[in-house]
């Protein structure tokens, strides 16, 4: 079975910027105003964020290739993954895999952005991306019925 997943760069960057904004706003209380301002990213930083998203997509391919075959491309502002799932794959997992890949990419972008300015906060986002990695591996392994 073939699973086709397309995720646009703009979706990933928009979500990452939004979450960075909310994180920055939550830190504006007290002495953390300077840090809060540093955390936030705008569309002006897309040239910095884009390579983080591309790196996340490549890392995702490496992960998927451990359990299934994947072809990956990036063009026209979209990441395209074509996954050849194992026999008897539960296709109900496909949208959940897409969601986990999206979360993984967003959290990796945020983690990379924060790694220089707030490594202690970046660690949280790298851990969240690792949770998505585990979820993807588990979902790719799901079958309609057990293989005997």
Task: Annotate each language-model stretch with its function.
Residues 47, 51, 55, 100, ...:
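Short, well-structured alpha-helical interface segments that form or flank functional binding sites
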Residues 39-46, 50, 91-100, 115, ...:
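Short, charged/polar micro-motifs that form catalytic or ligand-binding hotspots
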Residues 118-127:
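Short conserved catalytic/interaction loops centered on acidic-Pro-aromatic/His motifs
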Residues 73-115:
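Amphipathic protein-protein interaction modules
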Residues 1-89, 128, 134-148:
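Conserved short "hinge" loops at termini or chain/domain junctions
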